């Protein structure tokens, strides 16, 4: 948490420092809805559920990995035409249904994991409605594991793991509303596509 607050403080200082570089400050909020593909946090369900002890003892495993496509919601504040700071929420879910080899008893493991990030967006090229930028962020994912086993009572476990965003190659085609694409890696996947709206 201390690192995240430090990151936000640095981002705000950069906003103030770069403000004099922009003659046309927008000072507006942006809202973004996006879809990512296989985010950094999606490895945890594979290791925890897919390679878990219950799965090793089971047969007829039905493993559903919804977070191959991860939805995200973002809000950011344009300090000027170069710098924006904001926050991001992504949601992931994975589940596995299985039968035990010994007696055919059925169990289920599920994991829900929201991710919160603090982001810094840096525009490095603008031409009309087209822009290129980099997006960098720090945050954490909270993993909620729910085990339903026929051999013991229902269990719920919580774990938080640090996350990052590193998207150096990003494109936007809007002035007020439009499409964006981000390439890199982090909590939003290796590719993130979405729609941006000026508020």
Walk through the language-model features, giving the residues of each.
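Short glycine/proline- and aromatic-enriched beta-strand/turn motifs that initiate or cap beta-hairpins
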Residues: 22-77, 196-198
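Residues on the lipid-exposed face of transmembrane beta-strands in outer-membrane beta-barrel proteins
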Residues: 33-35, 69-77, 91, 116-122, ...
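Bacterial Sec-dependent N-terminal signal peptides
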Residues: 1-27
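Eukaryotic alpha-helical scaffold "rod" segments
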Residues: 25, 115-154
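Outer-membrane beta-barrel channels and translocator barrels
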Residues: 26, 78-82, 123-129, 174-176, ...
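Residues that define the transmembrane beta-barrel architecture of outer-membrane proteins
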Residues: 27-29, 65-71, 108-116, 130, ...
């Amino acid at each position: 948490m201390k690192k995240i607050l430090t990151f936000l403080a640095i981002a705000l200082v950069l906003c103030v420092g770069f403000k004099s570089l922009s003659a046309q400050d927008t000072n507006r909020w942006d809202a973004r809805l996006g879809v990512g593909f296989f985010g950094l946090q999606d490895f945890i369900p594979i290791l925890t559920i897919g390679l878990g002890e219950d799965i090793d003892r089971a047969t007829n495993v039905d493993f559903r990995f919804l977070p191959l496509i991860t939805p995200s919601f973002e809000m950011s504040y344009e300090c000027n035409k170069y710098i924006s700071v904001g926050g991001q929420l992504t949601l992931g879910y994975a589940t596995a249904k299985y039968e035990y080899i010994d007696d055919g008893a059925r169990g289920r493991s599920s994991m829900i994991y929201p991710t919160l990030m603090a982001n810094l967006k840096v525009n490095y090229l603008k031409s009309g409605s087209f822009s290129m930028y980099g997006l960098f962020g720090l945050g954490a994912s909270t993993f909620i594991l729910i085990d339903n086993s026929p051999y013991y009572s229902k269990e719920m476990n919580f774990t938080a793991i640090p996350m990052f965003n590193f998207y150096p190659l990003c494109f936007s085609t809007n002035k007020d509303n439009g499409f964006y694409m981000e390439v890199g890696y982090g909590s939003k996947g290796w590719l993130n596509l979405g729609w941006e709206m000026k508020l």
